Structures are given as structure tokens and as C-alpha cells.
Amino acid sequence: MAKLSRNQARKAKNLKIRTKITGTAERPRLSVFRSHMNFSAQLIDDSKSITIVGITTAKKGSKEYHGNIKSAHELGLKFAKMIKEKNVSKIVFDRSGYLYHGRVKAFAEALRSEGIEF
């Protein structure tokens, strides 16, 4: 049997995680995605199948190095303010199969420092 690539293994982990967690209107799911150059996140209400709010480093005007830990932390602070504007304080964190380390951890800690509970 062939060895799974990193991305295939991550997708398998993500599928396993997604069967256990769902987002509701009271407690939406925060899904993160990281690529080599960018980082993005979106708040999802799975009961209505809608994205409440999303953010990414791939927009015009972003800093030159948007794939690093510092940018993920800054993005987390901005995203926390956007979440609070939507009157959401509790979320379900979906790390999408990525390890809770580096950019994912920096993003999550920035959200927690702004008072978002998960």
C-alpha cells in the first residue's frame, strides 16, 4: 500500500474531526486553512450552511510575509474583533487536521487573548 502524502493524511484527519464537531448559530465553527504563503479562517454556521465571517492574509494591502506566525497572530486579533461585531463569544475550533502548533496555535491564542472562548 502506498504511503499517504502529508496533505492526504491531513484531509483524512480533517474528515474524522468533522464527523465529531459541528457549528450552530449559538456556537459557530471556526475553520482554519494554512497554505505555504497564506493563512485564512472562517466562522461557519453548519445548521444553515453559511459562512458568517471570513478573513485571509491573501488580500491586497497585506504585509509582504503573510505566511508566518506573527501575521497569523495579527490576523487572530483582527478576526476576534470581527467575531465580536457579530455578537459571538463562544466558538468551536476546527483546526482542519493541522497540528496545534506554529501558525494555528498563534492564531488560536490571539483569539483567546481577546476573550473568545473555545
UniProtKB/Swiss-Prot annotation:
Function description: This is one of the proteins that bind and probably mediate the attachment of the 5S RNA into the large ribosomal subunit, where it forms part of the central protuberance.
Originating species: Mycoplasmopsis pulmonis (strain UAB CTIP)
Assembly mode: Part of the 50S ribosomal subunit; part of the 5S rRNA/L5/L18/L25 subcomplex. Contacts the 5S and 23S rRNAs.
This protein's UniProt keywords: Ribonucleoprotein, Ribosomal protein, RNA-binding, rRNA-binding
GO biological process: translation
Gene Ontology terms: cellular component: cytoplasm; ribonucleoprotein complex; ribosome
Protein name: Large ribosomal subunit protein uL18
Pfam families, sorted: Ribosomal_L18p (PF00861)
Family stated for the protein in its record: Belongs to the universal ribosomal protein uL18 family.
